[in-house]
């Protein structure tokens, strides 16, 4: 089985592996992870200041559709996307209850996944856009790769956080190739 997560879902993947082991899991794929830790703290001085995170939450709370419109371009990076794709992703966010959005953001920005990442023992592919404004690659993707022994980091130039939607034409083949490579090695 291959576990695939995007954004906060990457935290779910690594937390699952750290708690339940990898007996049934052959590999993992982490897309634009928010791991290992976003918020600034005493032992994470390069993180995002909590005041900035609070301001982002306040902006979201004040006007969800406006927040989506303001953040659409950074979400997709330099990848050209159709207005329909922007509308589809925006609709998913707008249709999510506000309390769920806020609590999810608070959880994924303050949860420390460093120990979880260090315990991952399955082959892991990390794909991250170099223009990811939601989870900057130097704060998240590169550090995640450094904490998982033997992981592979694939950087998409010009891609943002929404690479699953904007860059699916290159993402899907890369994920399938990784799964195929790992299956061939296991055979």
Which residues fall in each region the model found?
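Conserved alpha/beta-hydrolase catalytic His-Asp/Glu region
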Residues: 39, 43-47, 58-118
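Catalytic nucleophile serine of serine hydrolases
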Residues: 7-8, 32
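Short beta-strand/loop motif that positions the catalytic acidic residue
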Residues: 120, 126-128, 132
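Short alpha-helix in the alpha/beta-hydrolase fold that links the catalytic acid
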Residues: 106, 113, 122, 137-145
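Flexible "cap/lid" loop of the alpha/beta hydrolase fold
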Residues: 14-62
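Acidic catalytic loop of the alpha/beta-hydrolase fold
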Residues: 130-135, 162
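Alpha/beta-hydrolase fold nucleophile elbow
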Residues: 1-7
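Catalytic active-site module of serine/aspartate enzymes centered on a nucleophile-bearing elbow/loop
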Residues: 149-187
